[in-house]
Amino acid sequence: MEPVITRFPPSPTGDLHIGGARTALFNWLFARHFGGRFILRIEDTDLVRSTESSIKAILDAMEWLSLDWDEGPYYQTKRLDVYKDYLQRMVDGGAAYYCDCAPDDLERRRKSAMAEGRKPKYDGRCRDRGLGPGPDRVLRFRCPDSGTTVLNDIIKGPIFFENAELDDLVLQRSDGMPTYNFAVVVDDVTMNITHVIRGDDHVNNTPRQILIYQALGARLPYFAHVPMILGEDRARLSKRHGATSVMAYRDMGILPEALINYLVRLGWSHGDQEIFTRRELIETFSLENVGKSASVFNPEKFLWLNAHYLRERSPEALVPLLQPFLDAKGYPARSPEYVARAIPTLQPRVRTLVEMAEQMRFYLVDEVEYDPEAARKFLVSAMREPFNRLLAELAALDGFSHERLESVFQQIVSELGLKLGKVAQPVRVALTGGTVSPGLFEIIDVLGKDAVLKRLNNALRFIDRQAG
């Protein structure tokens, strides 16, 4: 079997969105599965819309997802001599001709064709005029006016196109730049691409590209067109459905392995398995198991998956990932060891790093702010004696094991004739500022003796002020 070579050719006109990321992932996995090569190519011939910032955003997203490439990135704007050579081959072989039809005249003829019920395609006026290159002239492909072009798609099966329905598409614009359909074929030919895996919005381009391959006498690659991703309303996924760019998900606190796992399952399956390691994905991925119908992006399932990966990561591994989110909130700096001790208390409770950072607040601030309703309900005069007893008992302890803490609390509530909940919830408010948090003994253990005693004393002073 010949070496598998795939490619991912984004246009640098914006961020890398998840549809493009899934395409990159499928190409990457297919190449890695067969021990082949994965090429990154930047399609930047749209000089007006292509930007350096978009190129950087795409490369950053690929690196964040750990989709490494074996060659590239190649830039189409640096390959103009290659396209020029292949354009001349098309002219010399009679497969292309120059056209000087003015844009406004083309538009008038297009509207006339539509008014007469004809397909609004180029009418071939310059086909046999024998024009040479010149100002304001484009180069067009001489499309066969009969016959059928067949796209044998790995995913969709055979698709038939009548050549008479196709257009004499422009291969080279009047400014000398090659068009997408021509440049992509030349790139794939010269880079020996064996498999073209892309979104099914490219299906209608494919017969035109097949005809260009044939005109150049080049071998066709295998084609596989992946169904699109839809929002929950079954419309094509867009910004109105929420975040769609890869880096936006990073900024939401999503882990790259969670995004990889979710994207690959949007359209591909391997039995009933939901969770995959990267090694498992490489071993099991195949185009035969890509579905033919569109996939629906489910935000809740995605967050469930991210929560799974957050729980699977060790606290020590999460610290550097979490730290930028803590810094963004302006929390006081704490040692990595301290943050790592707090993380296990939050891992079962959060779905993103942003949520973890938000819930980490009470561990990091010097003084907690009380939720007004919680303070009104729980930080009351009746808590003076339990808090003072707790201060004395905790100050006398050498360490805060769960067994010791439970013994202290049980002893105090028993002696005061109270139920544990009547004391535990006010203590929770004193230590965290609110009524919802990880387990109380876990919190005390992480905060440590000094912070716990300080917060209990602060709560007593608050109670005194309220009573005064």
From Swiss-Prot:
Binding site for ATP: K239
Compartments (UniProt record): Cytoplasm
Sorted UniProt keywords: Aminoacyl-tRNA synthetase, ATP-binding, Cytoplasm, Ligase, Metal-binding, Nucleotide-binding, Protein biosynthesis, Zinc
Stored PROSITE patterns: AA_TRNA_LIGASE_I
Motif placement: 'KMSKS' region: 236-240
Source organism, top-level taxon: Bacteria
GO CC, one annotated term: cytosol
Cofactor: Zn(2+)
Record text on cofactor binding: Binds 1 zinc ion per subunit.
Motif ('HIGH' region): 10-20
Enzyme's top EC category: ligase
InterPro entries, sorted: aa-tRNA-synth_I_cd-bd, aa-tRNA-synth_I_codon-bd_sub2, aa-tRNA-synth_I_CS, aa_tRNA-synth_I_cd-bd_sf, Glu-tRNA-ligase_bac/mito, Glu-tRNA-synth_I_codon-bd_sub1, Glu/Gln-tRNA-synth, Glu/Gln-tRNA-synth_Ib_cat-dom
Chief location of this protein within or outside the cell: cytoplasm
A single BP term in Gene Ontology: glutamyl-tRNA aminoacylation
Gene3D superfamilies: 1.10.10.350, Glutamate-tRNA synthetase, class I, anticodon-binding domain 1 (1.10.8.70), HUPs (3.40.50.620)
Disulfide-bonded cysteines: none
Residues involved in Zn(2+) binding: C99, C101, C126, D128
Similarity annotation: Belongs to the class-I aminoacyl-tRNA synthetase family. Glutamate--tRNA ligase type 1 subfamily.
PANTHER family reported for this sequence: GLUTAMATE--TRNA LIGASE (PTHR43311), GLUTAMATE--TRNA LIGASE, MITOCHONDRIAL-RELATED (PTHR43311:SF2)
Assembly description: Monomer.
Name the UniProt record assigns to this protein: Glutamate--tRNA ligase
Provenance organism: Syntrophobacter fumaroxidans (strain DSM 10017 / MPOB)
Name of the gene: gltX
